[in-house]
């Protein structure tokens, strides 16, 4: 089919989905005014919501077009072994618990030592 037809179909689906949401909000407001607490949504609103969602999904899938094939061998053929296994997000330059493992005779004093016991932590 023509590409613009899928976009129109998606637009109609989004409009119908918006209308169904507005109808559900109006129904809830009406139920609150009439003090009916547990009244379910009417079947026409539920049906309109489901059909509008299906129509929107169908339009989105066809508007997006075909998937592009990804060939990993073409991207990986120029990489060396060192480049392939390089993960900079795993580099650690500063540990957050470095004060737990320092020696008791170190010159740096911790702010927590005044409130904690005088025994050093050893692991």
Swiss-Prot record:
GO terms for molecular function: cobalt ion transmembrane transporter activity; copper ion transmembrane transporter activity; inorganic cation transmembrane transporter activity; magnesium ion transmembrane transporter activity; manganese ion transmembrane transporter activity; nickel cation transmembrane transporter activity. High expression levels in brain and kidney with lower levels in heart, colon and liver. Very low levels in intestine. In kidney, highest levels in distal convoluted tubule. InterPro entries: MMgT. Residues 23-40 are lumenal. Pfam families: MMgT (PF10270). Residues 107-117 have a biased composition (Low complexity). Keywords: Endosome, Golgi apparatus, Magnesium, Membrane, Transmembrane, Transmembrane helix, Transport. Residues 102-123 are annotated as: Disordered. The keyword Membrane applies. GO terms for biological process: cobalt ion transport; copper ion transport; magnesium ion transport; manganese ion transport; monoatomic cation transport; nickel cation transport. The chain crosses the membrane at residues 2-22, 41-61. Induction: Up-regulated by low extracellular Mg(2+). Residues 1, 62-123 are cytoplasmic. Belongs to the membrane magnesium transporter (TC 1.A.67) family. This is Membrane magnesium transporter 2. It comes from Mus musculus (Mouse).
């Amino acid at each position: 089919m023509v590409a613009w037809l899928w976009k129109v179909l998606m637009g109609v689906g989004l409009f119908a989905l918006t209308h169904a949401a507005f109808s559900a909000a109006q129904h809830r407001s009406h139920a609150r005014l009439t003090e009916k607490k547990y009244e379910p949504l009417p079947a026409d609103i539920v049906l309109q919501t489901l059909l509008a969602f299906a129509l929107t999904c169908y339009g989105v899938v066809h508007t997006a077009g075909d998937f592009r094939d990804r060939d990993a061998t073409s991207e990986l053929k120029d990489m060396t072994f060192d480049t392939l296994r390089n993960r900079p997000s795993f580099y650690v330059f500063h540990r957050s618990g470095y004060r737990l493992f320092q020696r008791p005779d170190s010159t740096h004093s911790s702010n927590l030592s005044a409130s904690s016991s005088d025994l050093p932590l050893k692991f």
